[in-house]
Amino acid sequence: PSVIRDELLIKVQAADAGDMRAVRDAIRERRDWATAKLARYQRLRARLLDGRSEEDYLARAERIGPYLTLIRGISFEEDNIRWAEHALAVIARRLPTTDADSDAGDSRLVGPATNG
């Protein structure tokens, strides 16, 4: 999209003045949603290609518009996931290490180990 208007981004913009944990949770939710949507898109892509290469499909398919739209959706969700992972890592470094709400088992949110 040429313009992004998103309630989550408004929350992220104001995160420093608000509840950082709530923002973290909202980003996690968005990441999980994008991951599920990406999986659906990838299954659809596999069905469309039906064993053919992308090059062969685009050269021979009757319609290419739906495929081109699909690969834009795939790219969009991949970018959403990358951004969410980065944002979650930054937030994890900023929150206190004794944060009772942290996900100790979530390797995506754990910073580097320290001795000391």
PLM features per residue range, with description:
Residues 24, 31, 38, 45, ...:
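Heptad-repeat amphipathic alpha-helical coiled-coil interaction surface used
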Residues 44-68:
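Acidic interhelical loop/turn segments
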Residues 85-106:
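Long amphipathic alpha-helical coiled-coil segments
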